[in-house]
């Protein structure tokens, strides 16, 4: 992920189920990239956390401020980095793709079951496949793993094939419960 967020331009997507930490991961990326000399703007529904030094705009469809309309407005401000809370429709997808083509670094989330399906989803939204290929830098598929309580946790054996590739400390990390 570190290599993806350091790109000068392009589209970086995070996918996963609701509540899997997609926005949190992208907020961490924005915080890491923050520099007062960079113009970073977000359009979100809703703004989940306040990020210092980053201009965050909440979507408000009742007033005509959709992701697409907000993104158009943001691009007139010539940002370096844009975070689009979610690509939900063809118009937002198209604007995001074209923004990445014109030198912006775009982060967003998209609802698919896995990383590869994100490409098909963008194409289904009407984005030309060659445009997706031109700008998509990477897709992170994210899930949250369950944490096993201390009382239930038991170390489990691992295969010899895996064991020889791990440090002694890493070998103790495999637990079930």
Q: Which sequence ranges carry the predicted segments?
A:
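Short, flexible helix-loop junctions that flank or precede catalytic/ligand sites
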Residues: 1-177
């Amino acid at each position: 992920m570190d290599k993806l967020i350091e790109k000068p331009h392009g589209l970086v997507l995070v996918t996963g189920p609701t509540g899997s930490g997609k926005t949190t991961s992208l907020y961490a990326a924005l915080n890491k990239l923050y520099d007062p000399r960079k113009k970073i703007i977000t359009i979100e529904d809703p703004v989940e956390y306040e990020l210092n030094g980053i201009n965050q705009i909440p979507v408000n469809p009742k007033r005509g401020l959709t992701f697409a309309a907000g993104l158009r407005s943001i691009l007139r401000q010539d940002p370096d980095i844009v975070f689009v809370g979610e690509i939900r429709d063809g118009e937002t997808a198209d604007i995001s793709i074209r923004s990445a083509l014109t030198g912006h670094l775009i982060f967003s989330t998209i609802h698919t079951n896995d990383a590869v399906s994100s490409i098909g989803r963008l194409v289904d939204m009407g984005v030309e496949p060659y445009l997706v290929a031109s700008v998509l830098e990477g897709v992170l598929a994210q899930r949250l793993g369950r944490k096993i309580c201390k009382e239930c946790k038991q170390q489990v054996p691992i295969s010899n094939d895996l064991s020889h590739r791990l440090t002694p400390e890493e070998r103790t990390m495999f637990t079930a419960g």
